[in-house]
Amino acid sequence: MEKVFFERKSFREFSEKKVSSELQDILLKVGYAAPRSGGIPCITITPITSDKDKKMCYKASFYQKAVLSAPLIYVISGDLDMLGKKYKEPYLTSFIIQNAAVATMNMINACQLLNIETCYIGGIRSEMLQKYFEMNETTKIITLLAVGYKRSEEG
């Protein structure tokens, strides 16, 4: 328990070592397994590895260096239409944010157990990424998660 909750720190400078496809799949499963409002599948988790896409995420994150340094970025977004089938404002937007945050936290905890480092990035220009990734207007990007290994573990 200590490893997950007390030893975790945000990393901003990662090694170039890639996160394996197997581990990426595990992290996606863990994120999608997170509790959600009404049990409705309203979260999308998109892995980003291309330099071009990472540069746009870097710009949208107010130039947070962890985004460029990490070999893997997850874009966590919520679908207002999906959740809107059951909930309406003033609750809908806050529920989407909560669901994305819980999914992201699940992934962060899993990374910690797997000796993978993370940097949670909540300060983002969502609209910029939404336009870049050509998402519909009811999809809201909530967080980015930079994922990778410590520089000292590079091999």
Per-region residue spans from a language model:
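N-terminal amphipathic, basic helical "cap/leader" segment at the start of enzyme domains
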Residues: 1-72, 79, 83
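Short Asp/Glu-rich motifs
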Residues: 23, 50, 130-131, 138, ...
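Small-aliphatic-rich amphipathic alpha-helix that forms the alpha element of a beta-alpha
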Residues: 31, 74, 89-132
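A short coil-to-beta-strand element that immediately follows conserved catalytic motifs
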Residues: 41, 117-120, 141
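Residue-level "edge-of-site" marker
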Residues: 44, 124, 143
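A glycine-rich helix N-cap at a beta->alpha junction
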Residues: 64-70, 135-155
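Short secondary-structure boundary segments
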Residues: 78, 123, 149
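Short active-site-adjacent structural elements
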Residues: 84-85, 128-130, 152-155
